[in-house]
């Protein structure tokens, strides 16, 4: 039997939170981490996307995705209730960082915890998102960025993203 060690409280911001990668892969994986007791306390999962979606509507979308993409019999109402309480939604267009008010408000007061920005977006948005995080004061000593592969179309575009 595997042993799972709970992690410290964190905020995970998934840019591209309404996309296929988030709904099909990331959120089911996070559901497993919640179910195994690895994500505890006040840890939050914040989906960020340019779409104007109410939180309840986003939660319904996530529940539907979990029921669809988890293996048969793995979805449990109790684990979903725990995960649902951790999920937030912020409308946030990567191209207009001066309009990230919803995300800034959600992250205000949590500067001491680990803050992970998961960029489940097109590589062309990696730079604007990183710049938007900095411009909005969302980068702390505990901040991390996770980039979804591939990085660019070729060597030159990968170097451009990396710089």
Question: For each of these PLM feature ranges, what is it?
Answer:
Residues 25-34, 62-71, 103-105, 129-134, ...:
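Short, well-ordered amphipathic alpha-helices
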Residues 1-57, 104-105:
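N-terminal low-complexity, Ser/Thr- and acidic-residue-enriched intrinsically disordered segments
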Residues 69-114, 138:
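A structured beta-alpha segment of the ubiquitous adenosine-cofactor-binding alpha/beta core
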Residues 95-98, 102, 115, 123-145, ...:
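Rossmann-fold NAD(P)-binding glycine/threonine-rich loop
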Residues 11, 114-116:
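Structural motif
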């Amino acid at each position: 039997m595997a042993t799972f060690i709970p992690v410290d409280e964190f905020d995970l911001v998934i840019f591209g939170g309404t996309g296929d990668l988030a709904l099909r892969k990331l959120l089911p994986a996070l559901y497993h981490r919640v179910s195994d007791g690895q994500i505890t306390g006040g840890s939050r999962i914040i989906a960020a996307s340019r779409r104007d979606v109410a939180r309840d509507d986003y939660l319904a979308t996530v529940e539907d995705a979990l029921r669809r993409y988890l293996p048969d019999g793995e979805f449990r109402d109790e684990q979903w209730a725990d995960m649902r309480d951790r999920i937030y939604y912020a409308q946030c267009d990567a191209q207009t960082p001066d309009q990230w008010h919803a995300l800034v408000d959600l992250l205000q007061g949590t500067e001491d915890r680990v803050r992970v920005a998961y960029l489940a977006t097109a590589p062309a948005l990696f730079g604007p998102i990183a710049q938007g995080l900095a411009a909005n004061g969302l980068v702390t000593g505990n901040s991390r960025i996770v980039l979804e592969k591939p990085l660019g179309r070729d060597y030159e575009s990968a170097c451009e993203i990396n710089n």
